[in-house]
């Protein structure tokens, strides 16, 4: 019988491509008995272009590599100090639709920020989470055979200047924000427990096992 347990992997700071490849391999080889997983990772500086991404949104990449991804959405930036959470879930088994998963991820971030006294909200016209008009968290998902991969990227205490080299998520002039603008002491290490607690609560508090790389 299937056990509702999630494996949570803390992967630390990693290059984008090997993690992306591992995520694809996991999704391609999983079956109905495979436990769901959540991967927590920070990436070395990289621009990733979404499946429908348009080249004109990459303005001046400079020395930062641009990598094609198969997630939804347009171009975004990943770098140290940004907490990425990849959600490798069997949506059929969890009876979750894609829109419900997007809402769940947005609510995870809204709830996490609320605990820090930061009022944030999703936007109907542009997926992600915003503080005022500024974007603090980006979302991008892919569904294959009823299973999700990719996920969210929450700006914690990162250098935001590389976002000026692109139109983030395809929006010219989109301003970005990070948690440390309101909470200077914020780090990915002290944000992860809150983020994890909030997503697990919205997934009905399954058992989980925390694995560090």
Curated annotation (Swiss-Prot):
Subcellular location: Cytoplasm
Biological process terms in GO annotation: protein modification process
Enzyme Commission numbers on file: 2.3.1.181
Site feature Lowers pKa of active site Cys, where: 135
Keyword Cytoplasm: yes
Keyword Flavoprotein applies: no
One MF term in the entry's GO annotations: lipoyl(octanoyl) transferase activity
Protein name: Octanoyltransferase
Gene label: lipB
């Amino acid at each position: 019988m299937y056990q509702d347990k999630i494996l949570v992997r803390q992967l630390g700071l990693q290059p984008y491509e090997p993690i992306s490849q591992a995520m694809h391999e996991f999704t391609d080889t999983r079956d109905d008995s495979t436990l769901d997983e959540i991967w927590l990772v920070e990436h070395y500086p990289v621009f990733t272009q979404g499946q429908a991404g348009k080249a004109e949104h990459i303005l001046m990449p400079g020395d930062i590599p641009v990598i094609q991804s198969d997630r939804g959405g347009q171009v975004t930036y990943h770098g140290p100090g940004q907490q990425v959470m990849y959600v490798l879930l069997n949506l059929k088994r969890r009876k979750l639709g894609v829109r419900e998963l997007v809402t769940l991820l947005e609510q995870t971030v809204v709830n996490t920020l609320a605990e820090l006294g930061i009022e944030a909200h999703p936007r109907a016209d542009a997926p992600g989470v915003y503080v005022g008009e500024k974007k603090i968290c980006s979302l991008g998902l892919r569904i294959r055979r009823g299973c999700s991969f990719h996920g969210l990227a929450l700006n914690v205490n990162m250098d935001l200047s590389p976002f000026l080299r692109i139109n983030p998520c395809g929006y010219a002039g989109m301003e970005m924000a990070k948690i440390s603008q309101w909470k200077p002491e914020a780090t990915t290490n002290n944000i992860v427990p809150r983020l994890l607690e909030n997503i697990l609560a919205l997934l009905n508090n399954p058992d989980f096992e925390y694995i560090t790389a």
